[in-house]
Amino acid sequence: MERNSRIDSSGDLTQSADEDCFLDAPLLPSQKLQSVIRPHFHPVPTVCISILLALINLAYVTLAVVAFYFCLFSGKKKECNQSVAPFNLSTVLVISKLILWLLHVVNERFAHHHHCKAKNKGFLHLYRSTRHLKGLPLIIHSTGNAALLLILSVQDSISSNRQLYPCLILSVLLLELILSVICLIIYTVRIYRFNKRKPRPDIIEEEKINAYEGHVNPEIGFRHRASLEEVVEKQGDTIEYLKHHNALLSKQLLALTSNQD
């Protein structure tokens, strides 16, 4: 009994000494803690790229219409062929269309990268609401490429009708332009409004709304008008964000503590 009491007393002394060490440790400045817990807002830098891509789409279709008019309908076919030599007009059009499609691929990958970063920072609603929208222009142009290849493959079959071939190509290009520019404008407006609002992560915004309204947000659990897949997806994204945020917060706190030492 006496030995056990000595062990307990020594354990208590060790525990109290450890607690004193924690109490004597220097406190982190509140400004540094606030900067870690509430990081600065970083806008999604895809607005200018989307606007530039829409202008490139418009310029491409405009030049295609002008080229078809002067090469096929204005009687200046010889001068037009000399200006695009050693290629013909169809080859130049296909090469330009391929370059435009590659620009859409780069834009989609660029937007996807920054949307994943926004998702990791807690902007889950933005990621879900633009998940399909940011890739629609690429899908539209990929479908247009398939349509152009089909038209080019049957070019010899419709060579008897001189005006049908360019009209089909221009119809595909104009339809591509209208649909892709509409998607780009909707996406650009949505991202611009998001950057202008400078919101905090979704979880913090929901907590603020709950504290203001005084009741639990039903989206945390089950919503009557929400499907089970939406609820599971949202909860999974929330858990993933919390794990990422906790890991990042732990690293930053350890770095600040080591700097204090």
UniProtKB/Swiss-Prot annotation:
Pfam families: TMEM192. Keywords: Endosome, Lysosome, Membrane, Transmembrane, Transmembrane helix. GO terms for cellular component: late endosome; lysosomal membrane. It is found in: Lysosome membrane; Late endosome. It is a multi-pass membrane protein. The keyword tRNA processing does not apply. The chain crosses the membrane at residues 51-71, 86-106, 135-155, 167-187. InterPro entries: TMEM192. It comes from the Eukaryota. PANTHER family: TRANSMEMBRANE PROTEIN 192. Homodimer. Belongs to the TMEM192 family. This is Transmembrane protein 192. The lineage of its organism: Eukaryota, Metazoa, Chordata, Craniata, Vertebrata. The gene is tmem192.
